């Protein structure tokens, strides 16, 4: 049984033609699905014969909410979802004055091996399908009864390592027939898979591209990010410049500050020199400490000094506001702790 959420409008239209149904039915079905109708029999303008075909060939498959954790500090909510195969993923809902933002996962686990990230510790289990990525938004919207207006692909997984499914997701989530979330309200974060950055640039989407940089030199980057052994910083920056040229969109560089690893004033000056002249913005992130790693976060004073140096060098910079710190809202942390708890209980 296929999950109809995995289909784009074009793909569903083709299915209609192949099954001797009117093409316009595809758009009607999409309209029902993205209005939260979860049974084909409730699609009132569908002929019974088509409903029977849909029920025979498709399902509308959504994950179950396994756990919800709500921050007492800022209202951030972390959702732990379970799919039909038993695998778990997590999403984070962040509420702002300008609207609701959700951080979603694109893979179960991750194989990139970044040393400061909990989601990569057990490697990649599998990719999420297009529908499984979309379903995180659908379930949360239904739960809170409010619209999600901003999406960040910064949860578990490397989006460009699940390229085809993520590209289909970007189409549906921003399409009028889908969730109709403007591309300028979508951010995709990558550790820097260079060939895929070029492919993404050629699509000329209006999304924001965020690069997990975390170091100014290849030598230092290799210590914390294995991907640096395959793609150099120069290669990544060249791909970023190509992306900027094709899309006219500013790049965000993410920089997790780790005490005594990449947070010195020399690091800040070198980073500023590296990025000077680029249409970019640096987002400084106090590293999330996890049990399996020895990394410690930099002090507030060190972080502010780092930001000031970049700003004085003409680099646009912000320090990421921490959300949900009391509920381990960083990617991968909830899933791992939940699995360990279940193992301890023998479940």
Swiss-Prot record:
Residues 96-326 form the Radical SAM core domain. The keyword Zinc-finger does not apply. GO terms for biological process: rRNA base methylation; tRNA methylation. Gene3D superfamilies: 1.10.150.530, Aldolase class I. It is an enzyme of class 2 (transferase). Binds 1 [4Fe-4S] cluster. The cluster is coordinated with 3 cysteines and an exchangeable S-adenosyl-L-methionine. S-adenosyl-L-methionine binds at residues 157-158, 189, 212-214, 288. Reaction proceeds by a ping-pong mechanism involving intermediate methylation of a conserved cysteine residue. This is Probable dual-specificity RNA methyltransferase RlmN. It comes from Clostridium botulinum (strain Alaska E43 / Type E3).
